[in-house]
Amino acid sequence: MIAMLTVLLYLALILEPRTAVQAGHLPKPIIWAEPGSVIAAYTSVIIWCWGSWEAQYYYLDKEKSVNPWDTEVPLENRNKTKFKIRFMTASYAGIYNCYYKSAAGFSEHSDAMELVMTGAYENPSLSVYPSSNVTSGVSISFKCSSSTLFGRFILIQEGKHGLSWTLDSQHQANQPTHATFVLDAVAPNHNGTFRCYGFFRNEPQVWSKPSNSLDLMISETKEQSCTPTEDGLETYQKILIGVLVSFLLLFFLLLFLILIGYQCRHKNKANASVKNTQSEDNAELNSWNPQNEDPPRELCTPR
């Protein structure tokens, strides 16, 4: 009986963090790597975990490792902490997540973050067909090839878009191992620098050195060049608004002139009617002339 209680107590101590994580209602932490999640071999990287002001300890878990993989206290007056890796090696490559502990219990785990090490193998070569300068809407093919028998290749677009494509490698007799990435109907957002890497299936976070870079330039077709861009559309809208305002001002000005003209004509008609009335009165007065009448005769004869 005592042995059974001891086993149950041991299991409770082991499962306590997991159970608390599932039952907790604390804010979910956020994990990220600096300067990035794809790191060259033997360079340093910092894994950040952002959680809560109430956090007392932060825990970092690594997939397929004894967890917690690392533990840190919060930075002074901060709601986050950092886990330092001074020299990146293949043993640090993998999938990580973090969580924290507060007086209220354990938080849930953050989203998973994949930390990749590059430089473990020789670099593959990258080529593009038909050209690195094409018009929008055209299909192009990137070919990543290597003499190393990689199981998979990954094509990455560097920069703000951060697009990536992964394919299984193709093996043919007397030819390098390769993978062909087809981009149908390329668009301006595909502009940028591309590189590819090779890796083995059993170590998906341990990559080769980067291939040679290829700069892809996508130009617009004639039809697309006639289509206003966002900046062009904004300018077009401003011009259209200005034209409409001008038409409205001209309309109100014309309406004002019409009203003024109408009032002037109405006033002239009123003045003309007054003048006609005065002319008729003058005519009646002029029609009576005392010289045209006989002088009045005297009723009495002189003595």
Curated annotation (Swiss-Prot):
Expressed on mast cells (at protein level). Also expressed at much lower levels on natural killer cells (at protein level). Residues 275-292 have a biased composition (Polar residues). It comes from the Eukaryota. It is found in: Cell membrane. Disulfide bonds join 49-98, 144-196. The chain crosses the membrane at residues 239-260. GO terms for biological process: mast cell activation. Residues 42-123, 124-212 form the Ig-like C2-type domain. Residues 1-23 form the signal peptide. It is a single-pass type I membrane protein. Keywords: Cell membrane, Disulfide bond, Glycoprotein, Immunity, Immunoglobulin domain, Membrane, Receptor, Repeat, Signal, Transmembrane, Transmembrane helix. Residues 275-303 are annotated as: Disordered. Gene3D superfamilies: Immunoglobulins. Monomer and homodimer. Plays a role in mast cell activation. In contrast to the related Lilrb4a protein, does not contain any copies of a cytoplasmic motif that is referred to as the immunoreceptor tyrosine-based inhibitor motif (ITIM). This is Leukocyte immunoglobulin-like receptor subfamily B member 4B. The lineage of its organism: Eukaryota, Metazoa, Chordata, Craniata, Vertebrata.
